[in-house]
Design a protein with these regions (language model features):
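Hydrophobic face of amphipathic alpha-helices that form TPR/SEL1-like repeat modules
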Residues: 22-29, 41, 45, 56-63, ...
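Short coil/turn and helix-start
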Residues: 31-35, 47-48, 61-69, 83, ...
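Consensus positions within tandem repeat domains that build extended binding/scaffold surfaces
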Residues: 42, 50, 55-65, 71, ...
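Sec-dependent N-terminal signal peptides
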Residues: 4-14
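Sec/Tat signal peptide C-region and signal peptidase I cleavage site
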Residues: 16-20
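Terminal, low-structured helical/coil segments at or just beyond the last alpha-helical repeat
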Residues: 90-124
Length: 124
């Protein structure tokens, strides 16, 4: 039993380390201005359910860093991040909605639902 607990703990630490390394790669790429690489890294983490990565993707789409500026996709990512507990994303989504039409918001909600149903694999 003790061996199992130690193995489980090592697995948890390894998985946690791998998770943070990928996130750090995204942040490092962003800080270097390599936005397309940051998006690749954060999309990978978002597909695993990372609210922070989802929020970062929302920001990228909102400002058009490395992607074409797109309020609908920004809202989608902020909504997904907020649904996963990111309070900053919730605020960003509310602020963004002030500059969106009802049709855009509706489309963003449809996309977010589709993304969630797909297990975060069909999100763009």
């Amino acid at each position: 039993m003790k061996f199992f607990l130690i193995a489980a703990h090592i697995f948890f630490l390894t998985a946690q380390n791998a998770f943070s390394q990928n996130f750090d790669k995204g942040f490092a790429a962003y800080m270097l201005g390599n936005y397309s690489q940051a998006i690749i890294e954060w999309r990978h983490k978002a597909s695993s359910g990372s609210a922070t990565a989802m929020s970062n993707l929302g920001n990228m789409y909102e400002v058009g860093a490395g992607v074409e500026q797109d309020k609908v996709l920004a809202h989608q990512w902020y909504n997904l991040a907020a649904s996963n507990g990111d309070v900053v994303a919730r605020k960003n989504k509310q602020d963004l909605e002030e500059n969106m039409t009802m049709s855009q918001i509706s489309n963003a909600l449809i996309l977010a639902k589709k993304c969630m149903i797909s297990g975060y694999s069909d999100c763009d």
